[in-house]
Amino acid sequence: MAAVGAGGSTAAPGPGAVSAGALEPGTASAAHRRLKYISLAVLVVQNASLILSIRYARTLPGDRFFATTAVVMAEVLKGLTCLLLLFAQKRGNVKHLVLFLHEAVLVQYVDTLKLAVPSLIYTLQNNLQYVAISNLPAATFQVTYQLKILTTALFSVLMLNRSLSRLQWASLLLLFTGVAIVQAQQAGGGGPRPLDQNPGAGLAAVVASCLSSGFAGVYFEKILKGSSGSVWLRNLQLGLFGTALGLVGLWWAEGTAVATRGFFFGYTPAVWGVVLNQAFGGLLVAVVVKYADNILKGFATSLSIVLSTVASIRLFGFHVDPLFALGAGLVIGAVYLYSLPRGAAKAIASASASASGPCVHQQPPGQPPPPQLSSHRGDLITEPFLPKLLTKVKGS
C-alpha cells in the first residue's frame, strides 16, 4: 500500500503535482546533506575537544581540581538539561511535568532501578577517563580509547546475539593491532615524560574504561529497546543515579580533601569547559547523530584522532614517530571499515574477491539473480553503536 504522493506511485500526476514532487525531495535532500556535514563537524570537535580539554586542565600549573567533583557537576548539569527539555516537551506546564515524572520515575520504579547499573558504570568510566588522560598523552589516549569499539562489539554479540560480518571481525583485529603498536611506542619511551605520569596506570584505566563503556552501552541499549521512555527521560534518570553515585565516590576517594579545601577547589575556566563538554557533549551527539550515518561517525572518530594528534603536537609538544603513525593509521582504517554498512562491506568484499582473479560464479539454474544489496532493507542494520540506537528509539 503506497501512500498518496509517494515517489513510487505509478499513477501519472498532473503538471502541478510533478513540480511540487520534484522540488520538495530536492530541498529536503539538500537540507539533510547540510545537516550531515554539520553533524560531522560537531562530532569531530566534540570527540577531540573533550580529550584535549581534560588533558589541558589536568596539566596546568597550580592547584589541581578534584576529578570526582567534575564528574558530579557534569551529571548535575546533564540532569538539569534533560529536565528542561522535558519541561519544554510538556509546553511549560509544571503540573503535567510533575505528574509525568511521578509516573515514569516513582510508579514505574522497576524501570528506574534498571538504570542504576549503567549509571554506576558510566560514573566509574568518567572517573577512569580522568585517570587515563592524566597519565597518557591526549593522542595516545584517543587512539587507545578506540578499543571501546572492540568491547562494544563483543558485548553486543554476547548480550544481544548480534552477528558481525567478516570485514567487521577483520577490522576489530586491525584495531587491536594498531592500539598494541601505539602502546608499544609509548612503553618504548618516545621522549621525556613528566615525573607525575604513569603510563601503566593510564593504560589500565583506558582498558577498564573501554570495558565499562562497552558493557554499559549495550546494557543501556537493551533497556531502551525494551521500554517506551524517551531518551531525555532515560538520561534524566541516569543523571539522578549518576549524581548520587558520584557523590558516594567523591566521599570515598577524596571526601576529606574536598571537605578541607572545598568542592570547587582548583576550578578555572578550563575546568568549567571540561565540565560543560562532559555534560552537554553526549546529549549533543545523541541529537546530532540523527542526521549522520555510520560512515560519517567513522570519519568523525578518525578525524578526531588526527585533530587530537595535531593539537597535542602544538599544545603539549607531543612527538609523532613512525611507530605511532603506523598504529594510528591502522586504528583509523579499522574504525572506518567497521563503520561501513553491511551492504557496502559486502560490496567491498566482493570487489576485492573479483580483483584477486577471475571470478567464476555460476547461478543455480531456475533461481533468480541475487538482489542488489544497496536496495535491501538489511543495509540499514549497521554496527551496534548506542547513538544510532538512541535516534531509532526517539523516532519510534
From Swiss-Prot:
A GO biological process held by the record: UDP-galactose transmembrane transport
Entries under SUPFAM superfamilies matching the protein: Multidrug resistance efflux transporter EmrE
Entry keywords, A to Z: Antiport, Congenital disorder of glycosylation, Disease variant, Endoplasmic reticulum, Epilepsy, Golgi apparatus, Membrane, Sugar transport, Transmembrane, Transmembrane helix, Transport
Transmembrane stretches, start-end: 3-23, 37-57, 65-85, 97-117, 140-160, 169-189, 200-220, 238-258, 269-289, 315-335
Cystine pairings recorded for this chain: none
Known outcome of mutating K297A: Does not rescue defective Gb3Cer expression in SLC35A2-deficient cells suggesting loss of UDP-galactose transport
Effect of Q278A: Does not rescue defective Gb3Cer expression in SLC35A2-deficient cells suggesting loss of UDP-galactose transport. No effect on localization to Golgi apparatus
UniProt-reported outcome of changing T152F: Partially rescues defective Gb3Cer expression in SLC35A2-deficient cells suggesting reduced UDP-galactose transport. No effect on localization to Golgi apparatus
Effect of L233P: In CDG2M; reduced UDP-galactose transport in patient fibroblasts; no effect on localization to Golgi apparatus
Effect of S308F: No effect on localization to Golgi apparatus
Result when mutating C82F: In CDG2M; reduced UDP-galactose transport in patient fibroblasts; no effect on localization to Golgi apparatus
Substitution effect: Y130C: In CDG2M; loss of UDP-galactose transport in patient fibroblasts; no effect on localization to Golgi apparatus
One cellular component (GO) term of this entry: endoplasmic reticulum membrane
GO MF, one example: UDP-galactose transmembrane transporter activity
Effect listed in the UniProt record for changing G239Y: No effect on localization to Golgi apparatus
Family to which this protein belongs: Belongs to the nucleotide-sugar transporter family. SLC35A subfamily.
Associated disorder: Congenital disorder of glycosylation 2M: An X-linked dominant, severe neurologic disorder characterized by developmental delay, hypotonia, ocular anomalies, and brain malformations. Othere more variable clinical features included seizures, hypsarrhythmia, poor feeding, microcephaly, recurrent infections, dysmorphic features, shortened limbs, and coagulation defects. Congenital disorders of glycosylation are caused by a defect in glycoprotein biosynthesis and characterized by under-glycosylated serum glycoproteins and a wide variety of clinical features.
Purpose: Transports uridine diphosphate galactose (UDP-galactose) from the cytosol into the Golgi apparatus, functioning as an antiporter that exchanges UDP-galactose for UMP. It is also able to exchange UDP-galactose for AMP and CMP, and to transport UDP-N-acetylgalactosamine (UDP-GalNAc) and other nucleotide sugars. As a provider of UDP-galactose to galactosyltransferases present in the Golgi apparatus, it is necessary for globotriaosylceramide/globoside (Gb3Cer) synthesis from lactosylceramide.
Protein's name according to its UniProt entry: UDP-galactose translocator
Source organism per UniProt: Homo sapiens (Human)
Lineage of producing organism: Eukaryota, Metazoa, Chordata, Craniata, Vertebrata
